[in-house]
A protein has these predicted regions:
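A short, proline-enriched helix->beta-strand linker immediately N-terminal to the Walker B motif
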Residues: 149-153
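Conserved ABC ATPase "signature" region
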Residues: 97, 101, 108-126, 178
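Conserved ABC ATPase signature
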Residues: 130-134, 138
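Helix-to-loop junction immediately C-terminal to a conserved catalytic motif
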Residues: 58
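Hydrophobic anchor residue at the start of the ABC signature
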Residues: 144
């Protein structure tokens, strides 16, 4: 019997905004569970409320209908956006340390954690580098390390590789998978890419056009570890077609 007491539960979550043109319903009756250490991808058309859903999970927005229940009070959440949002006047090391500096953590302990994460994301030779000298992929590695330094209960990623070229994006997907397998966090990632979601996720939620509802909750049955070769398997093609058909 699977213990579901540690699940994050979204109970009939809805979100309505009031703007100048009237009432805008973004999310409608989103009902699902997110399991511990699960890698969940959220797919859907542009403007379908994927980012709003992520903001609700992060505690940055309160749903206007329904509720989100966490297994712990005040969960720690790490956030990574499409823009790395690095501080240009801080080095790679100092950007990663920023969340702990703001909390006034013990510096020696913080430095030890940061060094571990720098090794994890493969930036050992760039600890003193400035953000404007980094490639897009390297900047996102720093952003992921910064999000992990507080040892969050959940990592939320909003199209983290959306601004990268196709080849770098593929490499970063494989890197993210390696990091997730090393740290085993609960991950929720918004993406527009069907193949990216199938390479990374345990499960994919497909949202409809606004107001967004879940139109498909797909368990990704592909064996792990998955590499680029997985794209060419018959199972991958079948799942890809199911996702494509579900996205309106």
């Amino acid at each position: 019997v699977v213990d579901q007491s540690a699940d994050i539960i979204l109970e009939h979550v809805g979100m309505t905004f009031n703007d100048q043109s009237g009432i805008l319903e973004t999310l409608k009756d989103i009902h699902t569970r997110i399991h511990p250490e699960e890698f969940l991808c959220v797919l859907g058309p542009s403007g379908s409320g994927k980012t709003t859903l992520l903001r609700i999970l992060a505690g940055l927005e309160q749903p206007t209908q329904g509720s989100v229940r966490f297994p712990v009070e005040n969960p720690h959440v790490g956030l990574v956006f499409q823009a790395s949002n690095l501080m240009p006047w801080r080095s790679v090391m100092d950007n990663i340390l920023l969340p702990l500096d703001l909390r006034g953590n013990n510096h020696a302990e913080a430095l030890h954690k940061a060094n571990e994460l720098i090794e994890l994301v493969g930036l050992e030779e760039f600890t003193g580098a400035w953000p404007d000298t980094l490639s897009g992929g390297m900047a996102q590695r720093v952003a992921i390390a910064r999000a992990l330094i507080q040892d969050p209960d959940m990592l939320l990623l909003d199209e983290p590789f959306g601004a990268l070229d196709a080849l770098t994006r593929e490499k970063m997907g494989i890197e993210l998978l390696r990091i997730w397998q090393a740290r085993r966090k609960t991950v929720v990632m918004v993406t527009h890419s069907i193949s990216e979601s199938l390479l990374l996720a345990d499960r994919v939620l497909v949202l409809s056009q606004r107001p967004a509802e879940i139109v498909l909750d797909l368990h990704v049955s592909l064996e792990r570890p998955r590499g680029e070769a997985a794209r060419y398997s018959r199972d991958f093609q079948v799942l890809s077609r199911r996702l494509r058909d579900a996205i309106q």
